Amino acid sequence: MLYPLKFHPILKKKIWGGERLAYKSEEHEESIGESWEISAVEDNISVVSNGILADNDLQELIEVYMGDLVGDHIYEKFGIEFPLLIKYIDANDDLSIQVHPDDETAKERHNAYGKTEMWYIVDAEKDASLVLGFNHEIDKATYLQALHQNKLMDLLNVQKVKKGESFFIPAGLVHAIGKGCLIAEIQQTSDITYRIYDYNRKDANGNTRELHTDLATDVINYSYQPQHRVNYTPQDNQSAKLVKCPYFTTNLLVFDRDI
């Protein structure tokens, strides 16, 4: 018999990771940038932490319970591959400027799903910001010139953010999470990221991280899209719709007391 399932978090140390997710680590590790709460990404399958199904992974459960667990429509379409990845992101420093491919390109290049996602700002320090696309419409040549001249930041749309805001990040949108943001992210099951700019920073071993300039160029949406913030009005004990897209629908439920 099914019951409310809990999963062990899958923790990811990052060069930009902070301390706000350290409580999820038994060793209280530092620089944890991501905590994957529910994942079906290959080699990162979530494992149940509670009840009689503890120690079973997500794919094993779907194989047994099928539509009873994920719904008949989802099971018929995806089989045992759970279609969403849900995580927390703690940015103690700016994340790289990046972009994700859509389904068609991801299938062709990586035999994988694309990556459309949404963010909910769990917390944000003063002056925390996000990069959300370009600040005006450009073309590929303009983008490449700015990239090669180390002037990409001049083209990017940087928006200040605050706790409780939500944003939709479709595949093809150049984006980045800024320093001081703690974010809940819901996305397609995909770990494909094309890193296009990383501030020329180096890791603990003095190495710069790999960039994916050639892969990214043909998936970027170069148009000007000013509105990525989700408009919603939260009300106590009522559900507010945040994002509805072909891959997921998200709702926010705010309670007026602890539960």
List each model region and its residues.
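Tight coil/turn sites that cap or link beta-strands
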Residues: D102, P170-G172, G180, D256-D258
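Fe(II)/2-oxoglutarate
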Residues: M153-L156, C181-I259
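Active-site glycine-rich loop that binds ribose-phosphate moieties when present
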Residues: I138-F168
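Conserved metal-binding segment of the jelly-roll/cupin
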Residues: I97, K160-K179, I186-Q188
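Short, well-ordered, mixed-charge alpha-helical segments that flank or form enzyme active sites
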Residues: T105-A106, D127-L132, I138-Y143, I169-P170, ...
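Gly/lys/ser-thr-rich phosphate-binding loops in alpha/beta enzymes
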Residues: L5-G17, L156-E165, L173
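Surface-exposed loop/turn positions
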Residues: D93, E165, R257-I259
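Transition-metal
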Residues: M1-I138, D198-P226, K241, T250
